C-alpha cells in the first residue's frame, strides 16, 4: 500500500473514495462542512435520513455526490465531540480500511486530520492512523494453495493543510518503516518451525545486511559458543538436531566513538519444553517463542529504513528446545559465560538460559543501555493479559524511557517490581542459582534471574509473552509487537 500526503482541497481532488468523518449526533466538522457545502448539502441530507448516527466506527457509503471529483464518499463515525482515545481512533481507522477494501477503487483520500486524539499532536495522530491502516493490509498466506486475491486498493492519500504537511509526511514515513518492520517480525513468527530455525534466522539477518550496507552481521556457531563458555546457552540446544546460533547485528549510524544501544532477542524457534515436556494442547504455538528475536530483526528493518543517526547492536540468541537422549535433564548444573552456575530444575525455563549468556556477551560493546525482549513467562499473560508487555529493569531512567516510548507508540508496557526479596526464590543448595523460583511471581523471578547477568550496564527486560502473538481463532498469528515501542525508543534516543 502506498501512502501519499497532499494539501489539495478535498472538494477538487479526483479519487475513487473520499473519506469524511462525522461526529455523534450527525455533526460535521469544518472540513466535512466545506465538503457538504460544495456538494449542495448532500452529506447533511443523507445524515438526516438517519442511516448514520456518527458513533465510532460506523460507516455509510454515498454514491454520485454532486460537485465533487470523488466517485463516492465514505462517511465514518467519529463519536462524541472532543478528544478521542487511541483505541477509538484506531477503531475509526480500522473501520475505514474495512469499508475501503471491499470497494472497487484503487485509491482513497482521507480527511481525518481534524479529529482530535488525546495526548497526540499532528505527528502523533497521523502516525497512529497510518500504522493502523498499513498494518491492516498484512496477510500471511504463503502456505495456502489458493492465495488471497490481490487487494484492489493500492494508494491512500492523507489530506492535510499546508502548515502541517511536513509533520504529516514525517509521520507517514515513520509509520511505513515501522509497519515494514512489523511485517518482517510477523512473517518470521508465523513461519512453521520446520522452516524457521536458528540457521534460517541467521540467513534472514544476512539477507537484511545485503539489502542495507550499513548493517554488518556476524553469526556465532556452536564451536564459537563453546569457546566463549556459553554453557547455559548450549544446554538448551543440546537436545535438538538444530544447531544453536548467536546472531550479532551491528548498525553504526551514529558517531564512531558513540556507545551503542543493545537489543537482545530470545530466539527459541520451537519450545517443546524439553524433558520437562509441555502439554500437547496448544504446543504448535510454541513456534512463536522466537518472537523476541524476530522483533529485534523487525526493529532493525525499521531502523535501517529510517537511517537513524544512532549506533545499535542486536543479539539474537537462537536455539530449539527439544527432548532427546542428549537433552538437558532437570537437576543438571551448567556454567554460564559469566562463570555463575545454574541448576536447571525445569528445562522449560530455557529462554532465560540463552538470554543470560547473551547478556554477558553484550558487555563487550560497552553499551549505553541493554533491552532484552522475550516471550519469557506464561505468568506475564496471567498478570497483564494481552494488552501490555511486562517491563522490569535495574535503572529508573531507562524504565521511564521505555514506558514513554510505549505510550507514544501505542504499544504499551507496564512496570512490575524487581524487589531484592524476590531474588531469594532462586536459591539453590547445589549451584549459584536455580533457573526457576517456584510458582509465585514467575514473571518477576525470571527477570531476577536475568538481572544477575546485567549488573554492569543499564538494563531493561520486556516480557512479551502476552503481546507477541494472538492465540487461536481467525486472528491467530504474530502481532509484530513490540517493534513500534522499540523503534520509538530509538527514535527518541536519536532525536537532536
From Swiss-Prot:
Gene3D superfamilies: Leucine Aminopeptidase, subunit E, domain 1, Zn peptidases. GO terms for molecular function: manganese ion binding; metalloaminopeptidase activity. Binds 2 manganese ions per subunit. The keyword Methyltransferase does not apply. Its cofactor is Mn(2+). InterPro entries: Leucine_aapep/pepB (IPR011356), Macro_dom-like (IPR043472), Peptidase_M17_C (IPR000819), Peptidase_M17_leu_NH2_pept (IPR023042), Peptidase_M17_N (IPR008283). Pfam families: Peptidase_M17, Peptidase_M17_N. The keyword Cell membrane does not apply. The active site is at residues 278, 352. Its main location: cytoplasm. Its EC number is 3.4.11.1, 3.4.11.10. Mn(2+) 1 binds at residues 271, 348, 350. It catalyses: Release of an N-terminal amino acid, Xaa-|-Yaa-, in which Xaa is preferably Leu, but may be other amino acids including Pro although not Arg or Lys, and Yaa may be Pro. Amino acid amides and methyl esters are also readily hydrolyzed, but rates on arylamides are exceedingly low; Release of an N-terminal amino acid, preferentially leucine, but not glutamic or aspartic acids. It is found in: Cytoplasm. Mn(2+) 2 binds at residues 266, 271, 289, 350. Disulfide bonds: none annotated. Transmembrane segments: none annotated. Belongs to the peptidase M17 family. Presumably involved in the processing and regular turnover of intracellular proteins. Catalyzes the removal of unsubstituted N-terminal amino acids from various peptides. This is Probable cytosol aminopeptidase.
